[in-house]
Design a protein with these regions (language model features):
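Binding-cleft/active-site segments that stabilize strongly anionic ligands or cofactors
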Residues: 238-269, 274
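Conserved catalytic or metal-liganding residues and their short signature motifs at active sites
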Residues: 1-224, 228-234, 248, 265-272, ...
């Protein structure tokens, strides 16, 4: 008699619970926050971790895993929004984790880059590119600008080294495929292209700007590029170049005071800026001044340059 009662109770329990389990199995989740499973957890620890994140009841989860013969969860971050529980669990079993992306932009310097990585889901194990294996004697401006994909908890060093290796490969191919039109070596090309990158308002002007700087270098004139002063003041630049900054001989990036190129790039260069310098020749212009946010006026003489500055109502120091 007792045996029959137990069997009846179990049958009724299953009959009552099964529809609820089926409902949970197929109900889409509305939680925005993803689930994260740490690396190295056993299946039981992973179940506890998932249940702790208010994803699903632990008993039901074990029931589902048992009947679907699932014995492992893979570590990583999983999107659950709008997905039924069954799909989420199969994702965790197969390792279909969320893919993040990080955009390494041209014009970015190592300070910007460090902040970008700290704000991402990457582990920043490469502060200010300290980990990069490189032939260059500087760490600034040695990355290939592009979008890179990764998983939460991945090491930044892997992406950064990959980015650097892409740039190195591009520069090697450029160097061996053709002769550049000037006497700059690859280090110098990368340095000058970073200045062109920060000065140019649009891609169409890059060859002209490169031509101005190459012309000045050929004539042993100082580059007098404002972005180099700014870089030398980082990370404490307050947004305003003062006359004292222009006259500062202690700023080794101050091209108003130093001869030739600064000791390193001042940012990541776009491919178009690198090409503009690599294929550039000394141009007919020696000066330029911004006449809008995206374009410049170019001059052959200092007098013409000063007249344009006056016409635009700009306050540029005369040096």
């Amino acid at each position: 008699m007792l045996y029959k009662l137990v069997i009846t109770f179990l049958v009724l329990s299953i009959a009552l619970i099964a529809p609820y389990f089926a409902y949970l199995e197929h109900k889409p989740y509305s939680k925005d926050e993803p689930i994260y499973i740490k690396d190295g957890l056993s299946i039981n620890d992973a179940i506890s971790e998932v249940a702790k994140q208010n994803f699903v009841n632990k008993v039901f989860l074990k029931y589902f895993l048992y009947f679907n013969k699932i014995k492992t969860f893979k570590s990583g971050e999983y999107d659950i929004y709008g997905k039924p529980m069954s799909e989420i669990i199969f994702d965790m079993n197969e390792g279909n984790t969320i893919t993040h992306k990080i955009l390494i932009n041209e014009g970015t310097n190592i300070y910007d880059l460090n902040n970008l990585i700290n704000d991402s889901m990457l582990v920043n194990d490469c502060q200010f590119l300290s980990c990069i294996r490189t032939d260059f004697n500087f760490k600034e401006g040695i990355l290939y600008p592009d979008t890179y994909f990764y998983k939460k908890g991945n090491l930044a060093s892997n992406i950064l080294q990959k980015s650097h290796d892409r740039l190195k490969k591009y520069l090697d191919e450029l160097k061996y495929s053709q002769n550049n039109n000037n006497n700059l070596d690859i280090n110098e090309i990368l340095i000058l292209s970073s200045i062109v990158e920060k000065e140019a308002g649009n891609n169409n002007e890059k060859k002209l700007i490169a031509g101005v700087f190459l012309n000045r270098l050929e004539k042993n004139m100082r580059l007098q590029a404002d972005p180099t002063i700014i870089y030398g003041l980082l990370p404490n630049f307050d947004g305003d170049i003062k006359k004292s900054n222009i006259l500062d001989r202690n700023n080794k990036y101050n091209t108003y005071m130093i001869n030739g190129l600064p000791p390193s790039p001042i940012a990541i260069s776009s491919i178009s800026s690198i090409d503009a310098v690599f294929n550039g020749k000394p141009g007919k212009f020696l000066y330029f001044v911004a006449d809008s946010k995206t374009s410049h006026y170019f001059s052959k003489t200092y007098e013409e340059h000063l007249n344009k500055i006056k016409e635009l109502g700009l306050n540029k120091w005369k040096l």
